[in-house]
Structures are given as structure tokens and as C-alpha cells.
Amino acid sequence: MNATEQAANGDRGTTRSAGGRLRYLLHAPGACQLMGVHDGLSARIAVAEGFEALWASGLCMSTARGVRDSDEASWTELLTLVGTMTDAVPGVPVLVDGDTGYGNFNTARRFAGRAERVGAAGVCFEDKVFPKMNSFFGDGHQLAPVAEFCGKIRACKDAQRDPDFVVVARTEALISKLPMEEALDRAAAYAEAGADALFIHSRMNTPQQIATFMERWEGSTPVLIAPTTYHTPSVDDFAALGIAGCIWANHSMRAAFAAMRDVCQRIRTDRGIYGIEDQVAPLKEIFGLFDYEGLEKDENCYTQAPDLAAVQG
């Protein structure tokens, strides 16, 4: 029984791979939640707080690398960060933001293959041309031809090793201010090309575009959203529309950004740290999250001096 069949039968049993677990969540009743992360620390925190799946955000990883979200970081740099996430939270599904696939079908399938090898559950590619710009900045978002993008999807599906590895197709038609019909047509074409899920993106300040899309969508392929700008509804509200998953794409990084800026300002202004200790995480919380006590126990176990008398008989 594959992960899709497990979800249909209400079976929450473990699956063979991270891809299988993500596939299960996308087909289970309701809308799953994927927390945006950018490194091993943010992944550990998200899982410790109960998230079952993660989104390796291109914006957040690029920002963590100190560059813009416009394909300035190489895909090998980003997948190195993804590896820190899968190492930090083994078995937890990580869906990787693969931007446009960094070129043609060949670079897209190479990206997907490398993501699979570092333990990711799946990849998401968007239908903009390379190089891209972040969807929330500016208006010059040119889309790739439908046939070209479908070729990327097919190439990735043909090359994957794990049958449960998830390939998500993201359309930027609404971001590019194209008609709803264009978004629906592209979604249908991408599903036909083999996409395991669709990501419908909007930057309106209400969910109306998403609601309209779901009312008119006749396919069975799961639909994901990232409600970054239309943030009033809850995950349950989106589930009622038929959404399969909500990606909280960049909130962890933005929270860290604000906290780091504020503490830097405070220390510089106060010329000391006497006023901030109650505003930062205690070191014991960090030691606890990373199981320092476990390492100490292992040291006692594995570095004890041998009993020479016993060894010599």
C-alpha cells in the first residue's frame, strides 16, 4: 500500500520514506501545515513545536546565506542547507523550494535528484523563467511556456528513485496578474504532466483568488498555498475550501530577523547586555533542544578507561 492509499484508508502507519510521509499528509483529510525553515536550528525548533512537515524556503535560505531571493545563491548551496535540515530532524518530511529549477529540464531533474539524495521528501518548482525574482517583489514576473514547464515535471518524475518522492508544480499565473483561466489551465496541464501536487500562489491581501480557484478547480491533485499576504483565515478555513496544505513560508525567518535586529540595537544603545537577558533564550533551552545531556552520557559510556585486569584475563 502506497502513501496515497494509506491516506485514503485512514491509515496513519509509518511509510518507507520522507516522501511517503509527505504524500500521506497531502492526501489525508483536512489541510496539513508545512512550517518554513532555513537551516538545522529552525528545523529543530519547528519540529519541537509540533510541525509534521517543513518547507525549505528559497527566500529564507537565500536570506540566511546573505543574498537576495533571485537565484543569487547556487542550488548546491541551498541543498547543502537542506541537508542540515534533514540531518537535524531525520524522517520529518522536508519539501524543498526549488525556484524555477535553475534552468531547463536537465538542471531541474538534477536538482530534484540531489534533493532526494540529501533526504528531502520532495521538490517544488515554479513556472517563472530563470533567473527569477521573489514573488512578493516587483511586477516583472515572466512565465515559462506551458510545454517547457511540463517537460521539467516529466523529467523529474522519470528520474526519481523513490516512487513516493513528491514533485510539486507551482504556478505564478495569479502573481503575474494573468486571468484565472490561465491559472486553471496551467494547473490542469501540470497535473496531466505528472505533478503530485499543485501550489497556487497569490499575493492579494484576501483569499478571494484562492477561493475562486478552488471553486473552479475540477482536478483531484492536491493543492497547496502560502497565505503570506492573506493571513486572516485559519488552516481550518482553508481546509474547508479543499486546500490540502498550508505553507507558512517565511514567518520563522522574519521573526528571527526582527529579534536579531532588536537585540543588536539594544546592545549597541545600552553598551552592554544587562537589559536583555530576559528577552533571549536561556542557554539551557538550546542545550536541551540539541540533547547535550545525551552527548554527556555517551561520553561517559564510550570514553571510560578499560578495566585492564579484565582485558588481560
UniProtKB/Swiss-Prot annotation:
The active site is at D69. Transmembrane segments: none annotated. Pathway: Secondary metabolite biosynthesis; bialaphos biosynthesis. It is an enzyme of class 5 (isomerase). Its EC number is 5.4.2.9. Coiled coil: none annotated. It comes from the Bacteria. Formation of a carbon-phosphorus bond by converting phosphoenolpyruvate (PEP) to phosphonopyruvate (P-Pyr). Belongs to the isocitrate lyase/PEP mutase superfamily. PEP mutase family. NCBIfam families: PEP_mutase. This is Phosphoenolpyruvate phosphomutase. It comes from Streptomyces hygroscopicus.
